[in-house]
Design a protein with these regions (language model features):
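N-terminal cationic and glycine-rich segments that engage phosphates or anionic surfaces
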Residues: 1-88, 93-97, 107, 111-119, ...
Length: 180
């Protein structure tokens, strides 16, 4: 009888079995969240890759000089806001810049604006309303330079909550008023 009692005590309860399974294989909720994030990342990368075909239709490309690139399209006289045709970071950004150069599209370097557009906008959508003023300044500058005017590069002022670092974290309120 002593032996039988000892063996029974060694057996795991159903809850202990579940807990051990979660410890060794990970909880189903965490695994599902990881799978969902991987799927979203993959879909986003596919959208960025497909958007590269639209770069030749861009009005301007805003860059950070190599890490981020956002291709914008704006029709003068249109009542619509500028639209994001393509955007990417790293290799995709390099490809956007390369295609922009091939298509003779004006490239404007503005790290803060490029990151703001990247982290707050979506491919195929209009730019966020909070960035209208900054993008308008850039597009006006580009149109005038493309017409042959010799202008000084404008300072781009962004709303405080639209300033991001390269990881998408908002910058502290006191970090620079103009383009960094």
């Amino acid at each position: 009888w002593q032996r039988h009692t000892h063996i029974t005590k060694l057996k795991m309860s159903k809850q202990e079995q579940k807990d051990e399974h979660k410890q060794t294989d990970g909880s189903p909720e965490v695994k599902a969240k990881i799978r969902r994030m991987q799927m979203e990342s993959s879909a986003n990368a596919a959208r960025q890759q497909a958007a590269l075909e639209d770069v030749p239709n861009a009005t301007a490309i805003i860059t950070n000089p190599t890490h981020f690139a956002v291709a914008l399209q704006y029709d003068v006289g249109s009542s619509n806001a500028p639209k994001i045709l393509a955007m990417g970071r790293g290799k995709i950004a390099e490809m956007i810049i390369e295609r922009g150069n091939e298509s003779k599209i004006t490239i404007f370097q503005s790290p803060l604006l490029a990151r703001a557009l990247f982290f707050s906008g979506d491919i195929g959508a209009e730019i966020p309303e909070m960035l209208y003023q900054a993008v308008a300044v850039v597009l006006a500058y580009i149109y005038r330079v493309d017409r042959g005017e010799n202008l000084e590069r404008p300072d781009i002022e962004l709303p405080k909550d639209m300033r991001f670092d390269e990881f998408g974290r908002q910058l502290a309120m006191g970090t620079g008023g103009y383009d960094a």
